[in-house]
Design a protein with these regions (language model features):
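N-terminal Rossmann NAD(P)H-binding glycine-rich loop of SDR-like oxidoreductase domains
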Residues: 3-21
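NAD(P)H-binding glycine-rich loop region in Rossmannoid oxidoreductase-like domains
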Residues: 35-88
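Conserved Rossmann-fold NAD(P)-dependent oxidoreductase catalytic core, especially the SDR/UDP-sugar
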Residues: 87-136
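Conserved beta-loop-beta element that borders a ligand/cofactor-binding pocket
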Residues: 107, 147-173, 178
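Glycine/proline-rich active-site loop of Rossmann-fold NAD(P)-dependent oxidoreductases
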Residues: 116, 155, 168-191, 226-237
Length: 318
């Protein structure tokens, strides 16, 4: 097959590319940077999309890019990098005489919004059939993103929509400067937080009860491969592991894996001051997201529980 990936040079795109090429598929990226086996977003806007079997769109600026200040300009860039690229790609695919068989669009678990939950109340379960709890900025952005993708011609193209949770990738043993350079560069959350944990500075975020819908990068790749090959799959699928944990549980399991203590909790006010109000909601206000349709589709998670995922991804030595 020929697979076109928008945003292929990112964390998820690189992992998907390696997997599809390993099984003999041809992969082309839509990218801002020139290079072999790539086309540009200008090519897409002009309708110069090569004939292909599958299109996967991952493009979008990282919302946790801590090198960017949280302001109106950054919020506009977040929306434009998602909605603009998706609309351009959808328009190009709809205009093709021979369109791809399947279009996989992506968004985030932020679709479900956030809501205040009392200390003695469980967070409501949210699956692919659930409506957003509230429309904060991340939820509004994702709604616009999904609306742009939903303009695809479903009479000719099978549309699969994946909502990604917090992606966990392998932690590489690199220098401190390299770690700092990669902050916000979309390599998953573990490389970002491992250093403070190793220094004994790992912390629970706020009250720590908020759910953290996570997924191992291998399961992200496995699910995309499954949805490409499963021709009956259509509609929304949550890319989150069945074994969801709270922020406190996540923090304690990671600290235990690294043989480090948890000595403090980061106050919500401090988190908001550092990363911005809307961005802080991603860390402080969780969503209890379940992969209902994902499991019903027949996908089998390699890493359904966090402990096994951390054992695979996190080296104990600093």
């Amino acid at each position: 097959m020929h697979i076109l990936i928008g945003g292929g040079s990112g964390f998820v795109g690189s992992a998907l590319t390696a997997r599809f090429r390993a099984r003999g598929d041809k992969v082309t990226w839509v990218s801002r940077a020139p290079g072999p086996d790539r086309i540009s977003w200008l090519d897409v806007a002009a309708g110069r999309v090569p004939e292909c079997d599958v299109v996967i769109n991952l493009a979008g600026e990282h919302i946790l890019n801590l090198r960017r200040r949280w302001n109106d300009e950054y919020r506009r860039d977040l929306v434009r990098s998602r909605v603009g690229t998706t609309s351009s790609l959808v328009n190009a695919l709809n205009a093709m005489a021979k369109p791809p068989a399947v279009f996989i669009s992506t968004a985030g678990k932020c679709f479900y919004g956030t809501a205040e939950v009392a200390a003695d109340t469980r967070y409501p379960e949210l699956d692919e059939y659930s409506r957003p709890m509230a429309m904060d900025f991340p939820a509004s952005m994702v709604a616009l993103w999904e609306d742009a993708a939903n303009a695809i011609d479903t009479a000719r193209i099978r549309h699969v929509h994946v909502r990604l949770g917090i992606i966990l990738g392998a932690v590489e043993r690199v220098s401190l400067l390299a770690k700092l350079w990669r902050i916000g560069r979309g390599r998953g959350i573990l490389p970002l937080i491992r250093l403070p944990f190793c220094l004994g500075l790992g912390a629970v975020m706020g009250h720590g009860r908020q759910p953290m819908p996570w997924i191992h990068i291998d399961d992200v790749v496995g699910l995309f491969e499954h949805l490409v090959d499963a021709r009956a799959s259509r509609g929304r699928y949550n890319a989150v592991a069945p074994g969801i944990v709270s922020n406190r549980e996540f923090t304690e399991l990671l600290a235990s894996r690294l043989h480090r203590p948890i000595t403090w909790a980061a106050p919500a006010s401090l988190v908001r001051a550092v990363v911005g109000e809307d961005r802080a909601s991603i860390l402080l206000d969780g969503q209890n997201v379940k992969p209902r349709r994902t499991l019903e589709s027949g996908y089998f998670f390699r890493y359904p529980e966090l402990q096994g995922a951390l054992q695979d991804l996190v080296q104990i030595t600093i």
